[in-house]
């Protein structure tokens, strides 16, 4: 049995397959996901798993160079935004490199999410709890 943080085989495989600059979207239960896009659907019920708990586990295995958020999260979900930014700042310290943070309007976020290599759907049911993580290289 694997002893690293991600036990879900499909999610582990997606993370392992990411190359430099590939995007991985982690989203709430409501973000539209095209049928042709690879989706790791972890949603069990409302709130399980949460967006932040899923993000926390993914960040243990992914080297991140930048992230993308919807601008609307600042007003509609500031608590989630603040906790997410704290996690990203902690990760940047661990990685020894700054992580670029970019905001776009939600309609642009959805278009960019459609270009991600895969989407991880959580059971989160709060507004704009979505992020695109762009893979970096640890060397």
From Swiss-Prot:
The active site is at 20 (proton donor). InterPro entries: D-ribose_pyranase (IPR023064), RbsD-like_sf (IPR023750), RbsD_FucU (IPR007721). Its EC number is 5.4.99.62. Keywords: Carbohydrate metabolism, Cytoplasm, Isomerase. Coiled coil: none annotated. It is found in: Cytoplasm. GO terms for biological process: D-ribose catabolic process. It catalyses: beta-D-ribopyranose = beta-D-ribofuranose. GO terms for molecular function: D-ribose pyranase activity; intramolecular lyase activity; monosaccharide binding. HAMAP family: D_rib_pyranase. Homodecamer. Belongs to the RbsD / FucU family. RbsD subfamily. This is D-ribose pyranase. It comes from Actinobacillus pleuropneumoniae serotype 7 (strain AP76). The gene is rbsD.
């Amino acid at each position: 049995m694997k002893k690293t943080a991600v036990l879900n085989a499909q999610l582990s495989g997606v993370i392992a397959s990411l190359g430099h600059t590939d995007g991985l979207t982690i989203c709430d239960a409501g973000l539209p996901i095209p049928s042709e896009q690879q989706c790791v659907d972890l949603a069990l019920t409302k709130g399980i798993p949460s967006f932040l708990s899923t993000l926390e586990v993914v960040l243990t295995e992914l080297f991140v160079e930048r992230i993308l958020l919807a601008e609307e999260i600042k007003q509609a979900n500031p608590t989630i935004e603040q906790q997410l930014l704290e996690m990203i700042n902690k990760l940047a310290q661990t990685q020894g490199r700054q992580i670029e943070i970019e905001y776009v309007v939600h309609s642009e976020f959805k278009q960019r999410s459609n270009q991600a290599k895969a989407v991880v759907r959580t059971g989160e049911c709060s507004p704009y709890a979505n992020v695109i993580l762009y893979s970096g290289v640890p060397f």
